[in-house]
């Protein structure tokens, strides 16, 4: 017997169908509207741009909204509980870090990063690049410029990638003058997202992956992964390389470096072969729930805005905490205060572990130096140095990542906890070495309660560093700018 729907069931089915059709229609309309907006912009360009255009202001007439929001990366007014867009002297706040980086340029100067508009200025100003008075002087290679400017792909094209990397940092000072901008992430002709730095492409190739097959949503993270990653300068040519061949976890990259016999520097106190993590933001973010659910970097750091009927990406790249209504609340219904506190809770817990690890690791370096001074042999110190290397790699991997405590809180806690364990093991191993040498008392600790005391303890002449830097900024940088201006390399707002 045929079963008929009751009247109310029929109407319910009809209503449900209409709702589904309406929603699908709205989605289709939104897609078509977005496509029409993009088509309209592309068909009404006022300036034709071809090739690598490093002067960001050349894009303003075609993309005024994107350009104006990009200019806002110069803003330094936002501050959250732990970060923001202000330059904060981290060594002043955490003098233990001076000890951890003894023998490396970061012990001289390390501040929290500002927005992309400050990329060139901040690099010139940091003590880490020294004060080179000629093109062939200075402690750093030209590789250090790689992520700072759209002038980089221009010069790589002109010089060849190998030649770009192997020069001195100062040799390109007159060429790399425009801060991170349009051409770093977009093809000038059509503004499609593209990869402008070879290291990411090469890392994919070594893993048997084809980056050209990436989806549009994946590209909204991969353009960031050109720079916001762990990397190192390989060989005498200082070739920029991502250590992803074995994987992208902290242990995978450590295994890669161990196999290569690589160390960024030898620690001045402990003599441990130290790995300096850069900023493994992409790697850590991929281990978190948001990336695992398909959320891209741009979804949270460059949310869409609407103006005059036009929908566009906000190019004021910054912390999502500065715009919770357009980031977190797009998906989450909780209040701004609740969502902000959710982030702070994760950061507080990671920070607690970080503080303990920094304290123990600083002591481990000092105690290792004490053991050397007491006559310890390389064979006796072998295990100590390995443990210190492992502990510091885990500390730096977690600390150097921007936003890691939010991106992947469980992974950050695991990494820092493992680092703390390694640091404690290193201290215990040193105590055993000292006992064999006949010393069983506590190792005397120097006073490194301030940045100045810590820098003095590791032998830095900061007055000389600052004097040399001032001379460099007042003489060499103006020469670079003058030559760039004469060669028409500078954007109007630089």
Curated annotation (Swiss-Prot):
Chain sites annotated for binding Ca(2+): 230-231, 276, 278
Entry EC no(s): 1.7.2.2
Residues involved in heme binding: 144, 147-148
Organism: Parabacteroides distasonis (strain ATCC 8503 / DSM 20701 / CIP 104284 / JCM 5825 / NCTC 11152)
Pfam families: Cytochrom_C552
List of residues binding heme c 5: 290, 328, 331-332
UniProt keyword Disulfide bond present: no
Protein name: Cytochrome c-552
UniProt-annotated location(s): Periplasm
Sites where the protein binds heme c 2: 182, 185-186, 315
Entry GO CC: outer membrane-bounded periplasmic space
Residues reported in the UniProt entry to bind heme c 3: 116, 224, 227-228
UniProt cross-references to InterPro entries, sorted A to Z: Cyt_c552, Cyt_c_NO2Rdtase_formate-dep, Multihaem_cyt_sf
């Amino acid at each position: 017997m045929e079963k008929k729907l009751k009247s109310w069931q029929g109407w319910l089915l009809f209503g449900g169908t209409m709702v589904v059709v309406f929603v699908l229609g709205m989605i289709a309309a939104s897609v078509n509207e977005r496509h029409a907006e993009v088509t309209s912009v592309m068909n009404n360009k006022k300036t034709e741009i071809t090739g690598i255009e490093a002067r960001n202001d050349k894009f303003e007439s075609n993309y005024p909204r994107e350009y104006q929001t990009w200019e806002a990366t110069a803003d330094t007014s936002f501050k959250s509980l732990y970060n923001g867009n202000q330059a904060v002297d981290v060594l002043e706040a955490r003098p233990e870090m001076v000890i951890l980086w003894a023998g490396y340029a970061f012990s001289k100067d390390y501040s929290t990063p500002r927005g992309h508009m400050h990329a060139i200025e901040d690099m010139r100003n940091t003590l880490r690049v020294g004060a080179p008075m000629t093109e062939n002087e200075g402690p750093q290679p030209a590789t250090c410029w790689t992520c700072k400017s759209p002038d980089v792909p221009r010069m790589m094209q002109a010089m060849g990638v190998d030649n770009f990397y192997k020069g001195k940092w100062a040799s390109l000072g007159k060429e790399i003058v425009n801060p991170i901008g349009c051409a770093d992430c977009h093809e000038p002709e059509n503004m499609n997202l593209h990869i402008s730095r070879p290291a990411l492409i090469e890392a994919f190739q070594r893993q048997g992956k084809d980056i050209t097959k990436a989806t549009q949503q994946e590209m909204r993270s991969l353009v960031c992964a050109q720079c916001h990653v762990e990397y190192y300068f390989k060989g005498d040519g200082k070739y920029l390389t991502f250590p992803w061949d074995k994987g992208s976890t902290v242990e995978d990259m450590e295994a890669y470096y161990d196999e290569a016999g690589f160390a960024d520097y030898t620690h001045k106190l402990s003599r441990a072969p130290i790995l300096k993590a850069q900023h493994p933001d992409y790697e850590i973010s991929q281990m978190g729930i948001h990336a695992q659910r398909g959320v891209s970097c741009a979804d949270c750091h460059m949310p869409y805005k609407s103006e005059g009927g036009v929908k566009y990406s906000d190019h004021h790249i910054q912390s999502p905490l500065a715009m919770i209504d357009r980031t977190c609340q797009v998906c989450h219904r909780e209040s701004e205060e609740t969502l902000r506190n959710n982030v702070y809770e994760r950061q507080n817990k990671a920070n607690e572990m970080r503080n303990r690890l920094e304290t123990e690791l600083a002591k481990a370096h000092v105690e290792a130096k004490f053991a050397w001074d007491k006559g310890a042999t390389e064979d006796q110190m072998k295990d100590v140095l390995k443990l210190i290397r492992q502990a510091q790699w885990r500390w730096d991997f977690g600390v150097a990542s921007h936003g890691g405590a939010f991106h992947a809180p469980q992974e950050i806690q695991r990494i820092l906890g493992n680092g703390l364990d390694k640091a404690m093991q290193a201290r215990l191993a040193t105590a055993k070495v000292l006992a064999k040498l006949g010393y069983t008392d506590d190792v005397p600790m120097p006073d490194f309660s301030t940045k100045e005391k810590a820098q003095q303890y590791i032998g830095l002449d900061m007055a000389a560093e600052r004097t040399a830097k001032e001379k460099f900024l007042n003489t060499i940088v103006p020469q670079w700018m003058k030559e760039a201006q004469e060669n028409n390399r500078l954007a109007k707002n630089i």
